[in-house]
Amino acid sequence: MTIAPTTLLLFAATALAELVGCYLPYLWLRKGGSVWLLLPTALSLAVFVWLLSLHPEASGRVYAAYGGVYIASALLWLWWVDGVTPTRWDLLGAACCLLGMAVIMFSPRSA
């Protein structure tokens, strides 16, 4: 596997861990879920941090680029979990963010 697909898969897994880690407390606080949801929340957020640490790039660059993937993933979550269809403006915004992520992560670097 080349660096680009590996990076994208790692970003996608990271976004899923973060979204789950944020959604479970939402279920507890806003939807009457059990306080026990905080246990998988802690695990999910620990996995999120661990996944972010696996990238070979400088942390600031990884965090900046990951933001674009997170935005696109959050819109997929909006659609698949919340049942709300993203607007064309949502999709255009996510596409811009993903383009920014690609520029940040995959542009040539000096040695």
Curated annotation (Swiss-Prot):
SUPFAM superfamilies: Multidrug resistance efflux transporter EmrE. GO terms for cellular component: plasma membrane. Signal peptide: none annotated. Keywords: Cell inner membrane, Cell membrane, Membrane, Transmembrane, Transmembrane helix. Its main location: membrane. The keyword Protein transport does not apply. It is a multi-pass membrane protein. It is found in: Cell inner membrane. The keyword Oxidoreductase does not apply. The chain crosses the membrane at residues 8-28, 32-52, 64-84, 91-111. It holds the Pfam family UPF0060. NCBIfam families: PRK02237.1. Belongs to the UPF0060 family. This is UPF0060 membrane protein XAC3064. It comes from Xanthomonas axonopodis pv. citri (strain 306).
